[in-house]
């Protein structure tokens, strides 16, 4: 790819931007790792992150954890959940997890469905582990490299739609994933469910903070994953000191509502007993 094309698509700074914590590192090397990790995992919100992860930084500085484990702490943190988990639809969260943790976009419906299944069966932390402790992560980043955007270059196992899809998700360095046009909606669901490539639209103005001009990709569940799930939960007694008998409740929801219902139950102080597919 020519440098002019990369610049027009606002991906020049992202290509091959690899940060590794090598042996005999200096404090400057460590600070580069911190900055790269915060920007990769949180995007624009990363400017607020350093104050929230001083303990994790100390663990990495003292050799108690690896770069991979540092990334794991960030992705499982309440701050990451506040930025992306609580605010977004299930599919949008999966898109962002692929972007932040593997440096690419999901290629097809099966990759999205796999993470829906993991989340439904084993919860949020297990789903994050499925990215960070995958063979793909191991081969791409190992224990010492901060995840970076690999999808702009040819990578092992890459599908031809990969470049188009990551262009739709990336939208410029340091952008806000939550401030793009489309907000909390999936950017890829329609094209992924129809097995079609995304069009490539350059950001609206090169050299600035970019916002996608692409239309929001919204489709009904019948065009994507139309599975239904049953959530069994024990009702919570949040914000009350009165002893009450907790009732068992059952929710039948589409996979698009799975994440939102999960969050609502926990916010009310409930406990999820089981999630199963209908």
Swiss-Prot record:
Residues 2-178 form the PBS-linker domain. Residues 226-278 form the CpcD-like domain. It comes from Nostoc sp. (strain PCC 7120 / SAG 25.82 / UTEX 2576). The keyword Calcium does not apply. Pfam families: CpcD (PF01383), PBS_linker_poly (PF00427). InterPro entries: CpcD-like_dom, PBS_linker_dom, PBS_linker_sf, Phycobilisome. It is found in: Cellular thylakoid membrane. Keywords: Antenna complex, Membrane, Photosynthesis, Phycobilisome, Thylakoid. Associated with the phycobilisome, a hemidiscoidal structure that is composed of two distinct substructures: a core complex and a number of rods radiating from the core. Rod linker protein, associated with phycoerythrocyanin. Linker polypeptides determine the state of aggregation and the location of the disk-shaped phycobiliprotein units within the phycobilisome and modulate their spectroscopic properties in order to mediate a directed and optimal energy transfer. This is Phycobilisome 34.5 kDa linker polypeptide, phycoerythrocyanin-associated, rod. Belongs to the phycobilisome linker protein family. GO terms for biological process: photosynthesis. One of its GO terms (cellular component) is phycobilisome. It is a peripheral membrane protein.
């Amino acid at each position: 790819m020519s440098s002019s094309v990369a610049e027009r698509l606002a991906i020049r700074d992202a290509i091959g931007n690899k940060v590794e914590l090598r042996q005999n590192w200096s404090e400057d090397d460590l600070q580069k790792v911190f900055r790269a990790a915060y920007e990769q995992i949180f995007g624009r919100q990363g400017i607020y992150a350093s104050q929230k992860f001083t303990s994790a930084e100390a663990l990495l500085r003292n050799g108690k954890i690896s770069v991979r484990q540092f990334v794991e702490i960030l992705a499982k943190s309440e701050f990451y959940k506040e930025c992306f988990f609580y605010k977004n639809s299930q599919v949008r969260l999966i898109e962002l997890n692929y972007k932040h943790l593997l440096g690419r976009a999901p290629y097809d419906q099966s990759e999205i469905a796999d993470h829906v299944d993991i989340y439904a069966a084993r919860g949020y932390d297990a789903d994050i582990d499925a990215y960070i402790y995958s063979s793909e992560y191991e081969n791409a980043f190992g224990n010492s490299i901060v995840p970076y955007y690999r999808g702009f270059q040819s990578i092992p196992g890459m599908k031809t739609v990969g470049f188009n899809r990551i262009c739709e998700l990336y939208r410029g360095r340091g952008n806000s994933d939550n401030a793009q046009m489309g907000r909390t909606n999936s950017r890829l669901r329609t094209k992924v469910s129809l097995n079609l490539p995304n069009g490539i639209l350059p950001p609206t103005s090169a050299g600035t903070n970019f916002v996608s001009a692409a239309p929001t990709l919204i489709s009904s569940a019948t065009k994507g994953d139309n599975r239904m799930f049953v959530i069994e939960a024990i009702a919570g007694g949040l914000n009350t000191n009165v002893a009450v008998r907790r009732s068992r409740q059952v929710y039948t929801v589409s996979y698009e509502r799975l994440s939102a219902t999960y969050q609502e139950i926990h916010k009310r102080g409930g406990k999820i007993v089981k999630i199963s597919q209908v």
